[in-house]
Regions:
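N-terminal leader/capping segments at the start of a protein or of a new domain
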Residues: 1-7
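Amphipathic alpha-helical repeat scaffolds of TPR domains
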Residues: 7-35, 57-73, 98-106
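Helix-turn-helix repeat elements of alpha-solenoid scaffolds
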Residues: 33-47, 77-83
């Protein structure tokens, strides 16, 4: 999947977020400039809020999971472990899946 940053449409639609993979995030990070790498995080954040407001729990959980992964693996800002833990916990509250549980364990280690 080719992830696109758009200021005209700064959200992912549900179909896109559910089809997106961790490899898509990794490829985007490797191919994009620093500004777009950060913009992706904020598009995920905006999408999370949009899906939560619409009670689209699975899509919201996927956004939170991607945010946890992206913070923990790609961006690694100060406090990345704590921030990633916050978002993976949020993902699990919305949609408790084995994939999210495994990431919660990985982040905790």
């Amino acid at each position: 999947m080719n992830i696109q940053i758009s200021f005209d449409h700064p959200y992912f639609d549900e179909e896109t977020i559910l089809a997106m993979t961790l490899q898509d995030l990794d490829c985007f990070y490797g191919a994009e400039n620093e500004v777009n790498r950060l913009n992706l995080f904020f598009m995920l954040e905006a999408s999370l809020h949009k899906f939560q407001a619409a009670n689209r729990r699975e899509a919201a959980a996927r956004c939170a999971f991607f945010m946890a992964y992206y913070l923990f693996i790609a961006l690694t800002p100060p406090a990345s472990c704590e921030l990633a833990a916050f978002y993976i916990d949020q993902a699990l509250e919305l949609d408790d899946t084995p994939e999210y549980r495994q990431w919660q364990k990985s982040i905790a280690e």
